[in-house]
Every structure is written in structure tokens, then in C-alpha cells.
Amino acid sequence: MPVGSLRAAAVLLLGIAQLPPSSAAPRNGSKWTYVGADGERSWFKKYPSCGGRLQSPIDLHGDTLQYDASLTPLEFQGYNVSADKQFNLTNDGHSVRLNLPPDMYLQGLPSRYTATQLHLHWGNRNDPYGSEHTVGGKQFAAELHIVHYNSDSYPDISTASNKSEGLAVLAVLIEKGYFNPYYDRIFSFLRYVKYKGQNVRIPTFNIEELLPEKPAEYYRYRGSLTTPPCYPSVLWTVFRNPVTISQEQLLALQTALYFTRADDPAPREMINNFRPIQNFGVRLVHASFQEVQILPGTGLSVGIILSVALAGVLGICIVLAVCIWFFRRKKGSKKGDNKGVIYNPAIKMETEAHA
């Protein structure tokens, strides 16, 4: 090789060796995070869709809701997974993920949507509000997402993920309350997937048991993935009714996991892995039920408040009517006291007249 070529190669290698550390991939392998330089506010720089249209999550409130009688109950096919199989539970560096079998799918949507995985979003022990969607401004403790792809049109989730309505996600809102034995079938294994990249095989169970009561009541809208690349490809179904988990179960979720690998010198707790509410724009949210509006700060429906107000006005009218009736009756009785009294003017006796 000519000397000039060797010299050029040496310069090139030296230049590569002197590249700044920031050009290397992060040690934990993450291309994005929820906070810091690669946090949610910077996602759009690497993933343009994150700053684009139809982004999720959103706040579900009365001004955007429209009742849609065509929204029928979903059919959950293959959700009761055979006991002779196993689920794979893994820490993917962003959440805890449960991989789902390909014979699990949804019916009742425009196409058949096959399940691929489920995962959760949550807050932290000091601020235990970590749901992504909110309802009337109310944020819940956590949120479960069951992810499906349009298997009628696409061969796999990778192909479907950036297509219009290529994905369908079921969202379950989770609040603190009673112990939930169904969710514990996931939570009891969290200690085995403490760090990114760890996984464990766990017994199968009926995924439908993770859904809330009255699953026929839900919100439906077109939105996006809530994590990069944020493709606006999701047909969202957010169930109206939340499920509960206990304080102990919520604490386990908030403290058991790390974003980082076991050998990372700067471990980071997996907390606050939720995206803030996004601009709603001109979209509509369709509801499969007739919405009962709740007046903020009261916990009472608008209908109940209007009924109470109407009853109060009616009560005042009745009181006024009774008062007027008594007043008129009293006035009439005074006039009646003078009846039968004959007024005779004084007549001077004739004897007095001729005195």
C-alpha cells in the first residue's frame, strides 16, 4: 500500500478514536428516556412523529365526547390462554412487558387485530399518579395497555406500526383500592425482571381477567403510540371503568424495577414512565355509552345538581304560594268580622227638637 494511503488510513482511525463519547450508544442501550437529554420533551428531535398530529395520550372530557350507538362490545378471542403454555415476562428498559400468543385477537373492530404484548405505565411512591390517559382531568395510579396489530392487512406488528389504524390498543385505567389477584399474577414475578434485559417464564392465565367490569363501556378515538416513534397509527379503546389494585401492589410496581441493566454504574429506578397529556386538536372521542357529566369539585352529576336546583326553586315557589294564601285568608277574615253590624245614625228625640 502506498505511504500516502497508509497515512490517510492512520488519520481516519485517529479521527474515529477521538470522536466524543456522546456519539456512542448509551450504556443501557436506550435510544430515548422519560427525563433528561433524551426525555419526552426532546423525542421529536429524533422521532418527528412525536411532535406531529394525533398524539396520545389525551384527556377524555365532556366537550370532546360524542355518543356512538354503532360501537358494539368487543369480543376477546383466545384471551383465556391454555394452561400448558407459558408467558414471557421481560423488563424492556421502559416498562415491564408480557408477550402474548398469536392466537389471541380482537373482534368487533373494522379488522381482526392480533395481540402481541401488554405493558404498564405508573408514577412513583411520592406522587402515585401515573396513568397516561386522564378522565375529566383526573389522573389514575397506573394504566395497562394491551397492544394488537391489524393482522388482516399486515404480516407483523413492525409492518403495521406506522400504518393508519395499523394498531389497536386496549387501555385499562388502574386506581388504588382492593387487592387484585389477577394483576398479582404479573406483580408477583417483578423481582425476577428487576433490570433491563432480564426475563422470566410465568404461568399463563386468562388475560380477560385484567379487564374492568362492563367492558362494553369504553371511549374510542384515533391517536398514536405513547412512546417513540409515536406513530399516529393507533385505534384506542379506553375502558370507562377502572380496576383496582392494593397499596402494596402499587408500591411493588413503583419500586421493583430499573430502567438500567444490572451492571450499569448509575442505576435508575423505573418510575414515572408515562407521557404527559397531548394536544387534542380537532378530534372527537366516541363513547359507547351515554356520558353522565360530573361537575368538577362536587363528584355529582350535572343531572343530579339540576334536579336538586329545580326542586329547590319549586320548594320556594310552594312556600311563597302558601304565604300568599295565608295572607289573603287573613285579610278576608278581617272583612268578615264586620258582617251583620248595622250602622244607625243618631236620631234626636223629637222632644229634644222642640225644647
From Swiss-Prot:
Glycosylated residues in this chain: 28, 80, 88, 162
Cytoplasmic side: 325-355
Active site positions: 94 (proton donor/acceptor)
Binding site residues for Zn(2+): 119, 121, 145
Pfam family for this entry, one: Carb_anhydrase
Position of the signal peptide: 1-24
GO molecular function, one term: carbonate dehydratase activity
Known partners and oligomeric status: Homodimer.
PANTHER family from the UniProt entry: CARBONIC ANHYDRASE, CARBONIC ANHYDRASE 12
Protein name: Carbonic anhydrase 12
Organism: Oryctolagus cuniculus (Rabbit)
